[in-house]
């Protein structure tokens, strides 16, 4: 697998949180989703990749060539979109267009305004508002337009769908696909989310994080083949529980996650199995990680 970014033995230590050590390869030519609960370390990892936050140890290799995010050619090739304030609060759309055109050689004002139109920020009322007067969703549309208006090889987007309505998230997924397809295998996206439900179709590769660690990763279809979601009668839980990675139950049904290699055994014990969605996988993998932490804290 050819990678666009390679992370080796990466750590970042704070007083109350530690990222890593993380070893990852982000595949070139695909959209990779970083999935995890709030505080899992997604933003820290992305900020290190973009040179915004310093790492404590380890290396990040960009485009198979360099480990320096501050090099001019690397900065020109990476577009970044934060989930929080990217520009001064009193700036308007025209200020952002001017700033981006001065900062980056391959920023297109025409493209920027065209994207704003696609994302519904074209009317005079919105375009003349300062960022401080815009809703979170409207600000995110402006931030995304500023990132997509650059001619880059990699987009790094922190929680791009979190403040968007379902229609805009759907349009964003289309924009992801257009960006990837236009690169003929040379363009990649890394985006983070704590809720993949509305953006599942945008993720070719997924990395699940919990408490600063990577707990699972792989191409989306491969992971869906690796695991199975299941449901069963509650009275069957004792029989099938040894084969389950996690489970939950109510008075009427029991559900859980298992490895696909145990599919026939589980069905023979009365369970109904199906291919999991990424949303199901993310919830269950986070449950498994939480249960492991709880067991360690007891010990």
Predicted regions and their residues:
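Conserved beta-strand
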Residues: 7-10, 17-27, 58
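C-terminal coupling/interaction segments
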Residues: 173, 244-246, 250-299
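Helix-to-loop junction immediately C-terminal to a conserved catalytic motif
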Residues: 50
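Catalytic Walker B motif of ABC-type/P-loop ATPase nucleotide-binding domains
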Residues: 155-159
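ABC-family P-loop ATPase nucleotide-binding domains
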Residues: 82-142
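Conserved ABC transporter NBD signature motif
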Residues: 58-69, 73-74
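The feature captures the beta-strand-to-loop junction immediately N-terminal to the Walker
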Residues: 35-37
């Amino acid at each position: 697998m050819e990678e666009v970014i390679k992370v080796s033995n990466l750590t970042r230590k704070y007083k109350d949180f530690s990222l890593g050590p993380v070893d990852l390869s982000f595949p070139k030519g695909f959209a990779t989703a970083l999935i995890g609960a709030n505080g899992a370390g997604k933003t820290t990892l992305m900020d290190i990749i973009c040179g915004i936050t310093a790492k404590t140890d380890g290396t990040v290799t960009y485009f198979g060539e360099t480990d320096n995010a501050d090099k001019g050619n690397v900065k020109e090739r990476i577009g970044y979109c934060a989930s929080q304030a990217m520009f001064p609060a009193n700036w308007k759309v025209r200020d952002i267009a001017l700033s981006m055109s001065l900062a980056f050689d391959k920023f297109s004002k025409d493209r920027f305004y065209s994207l704003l139109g696609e994302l519904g920020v074209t009317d005079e009322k919105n375009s003349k508002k300062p960022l401080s007067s815009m809703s979170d969703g409207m600000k995110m549309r402006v931030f995304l337009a500023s990132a997509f208006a650059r001619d880059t090889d990699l987009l790094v987007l922190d929680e791009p769908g979190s403040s968007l309505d379902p229609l805009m998230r759907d349009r964003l997924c289309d924009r992801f696909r257009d960006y990837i397809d236009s690169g003929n295998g040379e363009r990649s996206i890394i985006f983070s989310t704590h809720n993949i439900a509305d953006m599942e179709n945008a993720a070719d590769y997924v990395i699940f994080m919990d408490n600063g660690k990577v707990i699972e990763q792989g191409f989306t279809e491969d992971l869906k083949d690796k695991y199975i979601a299941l449901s069963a009668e509650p009275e069957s839980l004792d029989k099938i529980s040894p084969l389950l990675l996690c489970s939950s139950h109510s008075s009427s049904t029991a559900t859980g996650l298992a490895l696909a290699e145990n599919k026939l055994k589980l069905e023979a014990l009365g369970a109904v199995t199906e291919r999991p969605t990424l949303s199901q996988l993310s919830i269950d993998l986070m449950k498994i990680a939480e249960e492991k932490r709880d067991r360690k804290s007891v010990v």
